[in-house]
Amino acid sequence: MTYARIQGVGSYIPQQILSNADLEKMVNTTDEWIMQRVGVRERHVIANSPDNTTTMAVDAAKRAIEMAGIDPAVIDMIIVGTATAEYYFPSTACLVQKHLNLREDIPAFDINGACAGFVYALSIADQYIRNGGAKHILVIGVDSLTKVVDWKDRSTCILFGDGAGAVILQAHKEPGILNTILHANGDYSDLITAKSGVWERESVPHLHMYGKEVFKLAVTKLGEIVDEIIEKSGLKQSDIDWLIPHQANLRIIEATAKRLGLPRERVILTIEQHGNTSAASIPLALDAAVRAGKIKRGDTLLLEAFGAGLAWGAALLKL
Protein backbone atom coordinates (compact mmCIF):
# COMPACT_ATOMS: atom_id res chain seq x y z
CA MET A 1 0.00 0.00 0.00
CA THR A 2 1.20 3.51 -0.80
CA TYR A 3 0.89 6.21 1.85
CA ALA A 4 1.37 9.97 1.71
CA ARG A 5 4.06 10.73 4.27
CA ILE A 6 5.30 14.12 5.46
CA GLN A 7 8.98 14.43 4.56
CA GLY A 8 9.54 18.08 5.41
CA VAL A 9 7.82 21.03 7.05
CA GLY A 10 8.40 24.76 6.86
CA SER A 11 6.79 28.02 7.88
CA TYR A 12 7.05 31.78 7.64
CA ILE A 13 5.65 34.64 9.71
CA PRO A 14 6.12 38.38 9.14
CA GLN A 15 8.58 40.18 11.41
CA GLN A 16 6.22 42.86 12.72
CA ILE A 17 4.41 41.95 15.93
CA LEU A 18 1.10 43.47 17.00
CA SER A 19 0.64 42.92 20.73
CA ASN A 20 -2.46 43.18 22.87
CA ALA A 21 -0.91 46.31 24.35
CA ASP A 22 -0.85 47.78 20.84
CA LEU A 23 -4.51 46.87 20.34
CA GLU A 24 -5.45 48.57 23.60
CA LYS A 25 -4.48 51.83 21.90
CA MET A 26 -6.64 51.07 18.84
CA VAL A 27 -9.91 49.65 20.22
CA ASN A 28 -11.71 49.33 23.54
CA THR A 29 -10.08 46.14 24.80
CA THR A 30 -7.49 44.86 27.28
CA ASP A 31 -4.79 42.23 27.31
CA GLU A 32 -6.60 40.44 30.13
CA TRP A 33 -9.90 40.31 28.20
CA ILE A 34 -8.27 39.00 25.01
CA MET A 35 -6.29 36.34 26.86
CA GLN A 36 -9.36 35.15 28.77
CA ARG A 37 -11.65 35.10 25.74
CA VAL A 38 -9.38 33.68 23.02
CA GLY A 39 -5.86 33.10 24.39
CA VAL A 40 -3.97 35.43 22.03
CA ARG A 41 -1.23 37.70 23.38
CA GLU A 42 0.38 38.80 20.11
CA ARG A 43 0.21 38.19 16.39
CA HIS A 44 2.58 38.68 13.43
CA VAL A 45 1.21 41.03 10.78
CA ILE A 46 2.20 42.02 7.27
CA ALA A 47 1.32 45.70 7.87
CA ASN A 48 3.52 47.78 5.53
CA SER A 49 6.18 45.13 4.94
CA PRO A 50 6.90 43.74 1.45
CA ASP A 51 5.37 40.41 2.51
CA ASN A 52 2.18 39.16 0.89
CA THR A 53 0.35 35.86 0.54
CA THR A 54 2.60 34.68 -2.29
CA THR A 55 5.94 35.62 -0.74
CA MET A 56 5.01 33.99 2.57
CA ALA A 57 3.96 30.81 0.77
CA VAL A 58 7.24 30.72 -1.16
CA ASP A 59 9.36 31.19 1.97
CA ALA A 60 7.50 28.45 3.85
CA ALA A 61 7.83 26.14 0.84
CA LYS A 62 11.59 26.69 0.60
CA ARG A 63 12.03 25.65 4.23
CA ALA A 64 9.88 22.54 3.78
CA ILE A 65 11.85 21.53 0.67
CA GLU A 66 15.12 22.05 2.54
CA MET A 67 14.01 19.87 5.46
CA ALA A 68 12.72 17.18 3.11
CA GLY A 69 16.12 17.10 1.41
CA ILE A 70 14.64 16.74 -2.06
CA ASP A 71 15.47 18.25 -5.41
CA PRO A 72 12.63 20.72 -6.17
CA ALA A 73 12.52 19.20 -9.66
CA VAL A 74 10.80 16.09 -8.25
CA ILE A 75 7.77 18.06 -7.03
CA ASP A 76 4.89 16.96 -9.23
CA MET A 77 1.96 18.89 -7.74
CA ILE A 78 1.32 22.11 -5.80
CA ILE A 79 -1.81 22.68 -3.73
CA VAL A 80 -2.31 25.93 -1.82
CA GLY A 81 -5.04 26.42 0.76
CA THR A 82 -5.81 30.13 1.05
CA ALA A 83 -8.73 32.52 1.36
CA THR A 84 -6.61 35.61 0.74
CA ALA A 85 -4.89 35.08 -2.59
CA GLU A 86 -2.87 37.97 -3.96
CA TYR A 87 -5.05 38.03 -7.09
CA TYR A 88 -8.34 36.62 -8.37
CA PHE A 89 -6.08 34.91 -10.89
CA PRO A 90 -3.48 33.60 -11.48
CA SER A 91 -3.60 31.23 -8.54
CA THR A 92 -1.18 31.47 -5.65
CA ALA A 93 0.00 27.95 -6.53
CA CYS A 94 1.06 29.06 -10.01
CA LEU A 95 2.91 32.04 -8.54
CA VAL A 96 4.69 29.71 -6.11
CA GLN A 97 5.60 27.48 -9.06
CA LYS A 98 7.07 30.51 -10.82
CA HIS A 99 9.12 31.74 -7.85
CA LEU A 100 10.47 28.27 -7.08
CA ASN A 101 11.23 27.68 -10.76
CA LEU A 102 9.42 24.34 -10.73
CA ARG A 103 8.80 22.33 -13.86
CA GLU A 104 5.74 22.98 -16.03
CA ASP A 105 4.37 19.46 -16.48
CA ILE A 106 2.64 19.53 -13.09
CA PRO A 107 -0.74 20.74 -11.79
CA ALA A 108 -0.81 23.77 -9.49
CA PHE A 109 -4.03 25.04 -7.95
CA ASP A 110 -5.60 26.79 -4.95
CA ILE A 111 -8.48 25.67 -2.78
CA ASN A 112 -10.45 27.95 -0.46
CA GLY A 113 -11.51 26.20 2.71
CA ALA A 114 -10.88 29.33 4.80
CA CYS A 115 -9.45 28.26 8.16
CA ALA A 116 -9.90 24.60 7.17
CA GLY A 117 -7.97 25.16 3.94
CA PHE A 118 -4.81 23.29 4.91
CA VAL A 119 -6.70 20.17 6.03
CA TYR A 120 -8.72 20.27 2.80
CA ALA A 121 -5.53 20.61 0.72
CA LEU A 122 -3.83 17.82 2.68
CA SER A 123 -6.77 15.50 2.07
CA ILE A 124 -6.73 16.16 -1.68
CA ALA A 125 -2.98 15.57 -1.84
CA ASP A 126 -3.34 12.34 0.12
CA GLN A 127 -5.81 10.97 -2.42
CA TYR A 128 -3.57 11.84 -5.35
CA ILE A 129 -0.63 9.99 -3.81
CA ARG A 130 -2.69 6.98 -2.73
CA ASN A 131 -4.04 6.66 -6.27
CA GLY A 132 -0.66 7.03 -7.95
CA GLY A 133 -1.33 10.47 -9.41
CA ALA A 134 1.70 12.10 -7.78
CA LYS A 135 4.76 11.19 -5.70
CA HIS A 136 5.97 14.51 -4.25
CA ILE A 137 3.34 17.14 -3.46
CA LEU A 138 3.96 20.59 -2.03
CA VAL A 139 1.01 21.50 0.22
CA ILE A 140 0.80 25.03 1.59
CA GLY A 141 -1.56 26.81 3.97
CA VAL A 142 -1.24 30.59 3.83
CA ASP A 143 -3.37 33.59 4.70
CA SER A 144 -3.15 37.35 5.16
CA LEU A 145 -6.37 37.93 7.07
CA THR A 146 -5.16 41.14 8.68
CA LYS A 147 -5.69 42.68 5.25
CA VAL A 148 -9.46 42.10 5.51
CA VAL A 149 -9.89 42.75 9.23
CA ASP A 150 -11.94 45.74 10.37
CA TRP A 151 -9.55 47.37 12.83
CA LYS A 152 -12.46 49.16 14.50
CA ASP A 153 -14.26 45.90 15.31
CA ARG A 154 -12.83 44.71 18.61
CA SER A 155 -14.60 41.36 18.37
CA THR A 156 -12.59 40.30 15.30
CA CYS A 157 -9.47 42.46 15.00
CA ILE A 158 -8.00 40.87 18.13
CA LEU A 159 -8.07 37.39 16.63
CA PHE A 160 -6.00 37.27 13.48
CA GLY A 161 -2.39 37.17 12.36
CA ASP A 162 -0.63 36.44 9.07
CA GLY A 163 1.61 33.55 8.07
CA ALA A 164 2.29 30.47 5.98
CA GLY A 165 3.10 26.83 6.57
CA ALA A 166 4.06 24.10 4.13
CA VAL A 167 4.70 20.37 3.97
CA ILE A 168 6.23 18.06 1.41
CA LEU A 169 4.14 14.91 1.04
CA GLN A 170 5.96 11.95 -0.46
CA ALA A 171 4.75 8.55 -1.62
CA HIS A 172 6.01 5.99 0.89
CA LYS A 173 5.50 2.39 1.96
CA GLU A 174 5.65 3.34 5.64
CA PRO A 175 2.39 4.65 7.16
CA GLY A 176 1.84 8.38 6.81
CA ILE A 177 -1.62 9.90 6.48
CA LEU A 178 -4.01 7.25 7.81
CA ASN A 179 -7.31 9.02 7.16
CA THR A 180 -8.85 12.37 6.41
CA ILE A 181 -12.45 13.50 6.77
CA LEU A 182 -13.96 16.68 5.31
CA HIS A 183 -17.37 18.20 6.04
CA ALA A 184 -19.22 21.38 5.10
CA ASN A 185 -22.60 23.02 5.64
CA GLY A 186 -23.44 26.04 3.51
CA ASP A 187 -26.57 26.73 5.55
CA TYR A 188 -24.21 28.52 7.95
CA SER A 189 -22.43 30.49 5.23
CA ASP A 190 -23.47 33.88 6.64
CA LEU A 191 -21.75 33.30 9.99
CA ILE A 192 -18.24 34.18 8.71
CA THR A 193 -17.91 36.33 5.60
CA ALA A 194 -15.61 38.69 3.74
CA LYS A 195 -17.67 39.91 0.81
CA SER A 196 -15.17 41.03 -1.78
CA GLY A 197 -16.15 38.85 -4.71
CA VAL A 198 -17.03 39.82 -8.27
CA TRP A 199 -20.80 39.92 -7.72
CA GLU A 200 -21.06 41.25 -4.19
CA ARG A 201 -18.39 43.71 -3.18
CA GLU A 202 -17.87 45.98 -0.20
CA SER A 203 -15.98 49.22 -0.84
CA VAL A 204 -13.43 47.95 1.68
CA PRO A 205 -13.79 44.19 2.18
CA HIS A 206 -14.00 43.38 5.87
CA LEU A 207 -14.28 40.13 7.73
CA HIS A 208 -17.57 39.74 9.61
CA MET A 209 -18.23 36.98 12.12
CA TYR A 210 -21.02 35.98 14.48
CA GLY A 211 -18.65 34.83 17.19
CA LYS A 212 -21.01 33.18 19.67
CA GLU A 213 -22.71 31.06 17.03
CA VAL A 214 -19.39 30.08 15.46
CA PHE A 215 -17.97 29.11 18.86
CA LYS A 216 -20.87 26.78 19.65
CA LEU A 217 -20.79 25.12 16.24
CA ALA A 218 -17.01 24.74 16.29
CA VAL A 219 -17.03 22.97 19.65
CA THR A 220 -19.81 20.63 18.50
CA LYS A 221 -18.57 19.84 14.99
CA LEU A 222 -14.91 19.42 15.94
CA GLY A 223 -15.88 17.14 18.81
CA GLU A 224 -17.90 15.00 16.43
CA ILE A 225 -15.26 14.83 13.69
CA VAL A 226 -12.39 13.82 15.96
CA ASP A 227 -14.52 10.95 17.26
CA GLU A 228 -15.45 10.05 13.69
CA ILE A 229 -11.90 9.92 12.35
CA ILE A 230 -10.56 7.89 15.28
CA GLU A 231 -13.36 5.34 14.83
CA LYS A 232 -12.88 5.27 11.05
CA SER A 233 -9.19 4.56 11.52
CA GLY A 234 -9.76 1.72 13.98
CA LEU A 235 -7.82 3.51 16.72
CA LYS A 236 -8.50 4.58 20.29
CA GLN A 237 -8.18 8.02 21.85
CA SER A 238 -5.19 6.71 23.79
CA ASP A 239 -3.38 6.08 20.48
CA ILE A 240 -3.16 9.83 19.78
CA ASP A 241 0.21 11.29 20.74
CA TRP A 242 -0.45 14.88 19.74
CA LEU A 243 -3.39 17.11 18.88
CA ILE A 244 -2.50 19.86 16.41
CA PRO A 245 -5.63 22.00 16.25
CA HIS A 246 -6.51 25.04 14.21
CA GLN A 247 -5.38 27.89 16.45
CA ALA A 248 -8.62 29.88 16.51
CA ASN A 249 -9.66 30.08 20.14
CA LEU A 250 -8.06 28.51 23.21
CA ARG A 251 -11.44 27.56 24.68
CA ILE A 252 -12.40 25.67 21.51
CA ILE A 253 -9.04 23.88 21.56
CA GLU A 254 -9.46 22.96 25.23
CA ALA A 255 -12.93 21.54 24.54
CA THR A 256 -11.56 19.25 21.81
CA ALA A 257 -8.62 18.15 23.96
CA LYS A 258 -11.00 17.34 26.81
CA ARG A 259 -13.14 15.28 24.45
CA LEU A 260 -10.02 13.30 23.49
CA GLY A 261 -8.81 12.96 27.07
CA LEU A 262 -5.55 14.68 26.16
CA PRO A 263 -3.67 16.77 28.73
CA ARG A 264 -2.60 20.25 27.69
CA GLU A 265 1.03 19.17 27.34
CA ARG A 266 -0.01 16.86 24.44
CA VAL A 267 -1.64 19.73 22.53
CA ILE A 268 0.47 21.88 20.22
CA LEU A 269 -0.38 25.50 21.00
CA THR A 270 0.89 28.54 19.13
CA ILE A 271 -2.20 30.71 19.43
CA GLU A 272 -0.68 32.92 22.13
CA GLN A 273 2.19 33.94 19.83
CA HIS A 274 0.53 33.75 16.39
CA GLY A 275 -3.18 34.34 16.83
CA ASN A 276 -5.49 32.81 14.23
CA THR A 277 -3.53 32.55 10.97
CA SER A 278 -6.38 30.74 9.20
CA ALA A 279 -5.15 28.09 6.74
CA ALA A 280 -1.58 28.60 7.97
CA SER A 281 -2.23 27.80 11.62
CA ILE A 282 -1.89 24.00 11.55
CA PRO A 283 1.27 23.78 9.42
CA LEU A 284 2.77 26.69 11.40
CA ALA A 285 2.14 24.80 14.64
CA LEU A 286 3.42 21.53 13.15
CA ASP A 287 6.63 23.18 11.96
CA ALA A 288 7.23 24.82 15.34
CA ALA A 289 6.71 21.53 17.18
CA VAL A 290 8.94 19.51 14.86
CA ARG A 291 11.78 22.03 14.98
CA ALA A 292 11.49 22.25 18.78
CA GLY A 293 11.91 18.47 18.99
CA LYS A 294 8.48 17.90 20.55
CA ILE A 295 7.05 15.83 17.72
CA LYS A 296 9.18 12.97 16.42
CA ARG A 297 9.07 10.51 13.55
CA GLY A 298 6.50 7.79 14.27
CA ASP A 299 4.24 9.91 16.49
CA THR A 300 0.50 9.76 15.81
CA LEU A 301 -0.97 13.19 15.12
CA LEU A 302 -4.56 14.37 14.96
CA LEU A 303 -5.15 17.58 12.99
CA GLU A 304 -8.49 19.40 13.00
CA ALA A 305 -9.79 22.70 11.68
CA PHE A 306 -13.02 24.65 11.31
CA GLY A 307 -13.71 27.74 9.24
CA ALA A 308 -15.97 29.82 7.04
CA GLY A 309 -18.32 27.99 4.75
CA LEU A 310 -18.88 26.47 7.17
CA ALA A 311 -16.17 23.92 6.41
CA TRP A 312 -14.36 21.63 8.80
CA GLY A 313 -12.08 18.63 8.61
CA ALA A 314 -9.65 16.32 10.35
CA ALA A 315 -6.57 14.31 9.45
CA LEU A 316 -5.00 11.42 11.33
CA LEU A 317 -1.41 10.59 10.48
CA LYS A 318 1.89 9.05 11.47
CA LEU A 319 4.71 11.52 11.14
From Swiss-Prot:
It catalyses: malonyl-[ACP] + acetyl-CoA + H(+) = 3-oxobutanoyl-[ACP] + CO2 + CoA. GO terms for cellular component: cytoplasm. Its EC number is 2.3.1.180. The active site is at residues 115, 246, 276. Pfam families: ACP_syn_III, ACP_syn_III_C. It comes from the Bacteria. Its main location: cytoplasm. It is found in: Cytoplasm. GO terms for biological process: fatty acid biosynthetic process. Keywords: Acyltransferase, Cytoplasm, Fatty acid biosynthesis, Fatty acid metabolism, Lipid biosynthesis, Lipid metabolism, Multifunctional enzyme, Transferase. It is an enzyme of class 2 (transferase). GO terms for molecular function: 3-oxoacyl-[acyl-carrier-protein] synthase activity; beta-ketoacyl-acyl-carrier-protein synthase III activity. Pathway: Lipid metabolism; fatty acid biosynthesis. The keyword RNA-binding does not apply. Residues 247-251 are annotated as: ACP-binding. SUPFAM superfamilies: Thiolase-like. InterPro entries: ACP_syn_III_C, ACP_syn_III_N, FabH, Thiolase-like. Transmembrane segments: none annotated. Homodimer. HAMAP family: FabH. The last Arg residue of the ACP-binding site is essential for the weak association between ACP/AcpP and FabH. This is Beta-ketoacyl-[acyl-carrier-protein] synthase III.
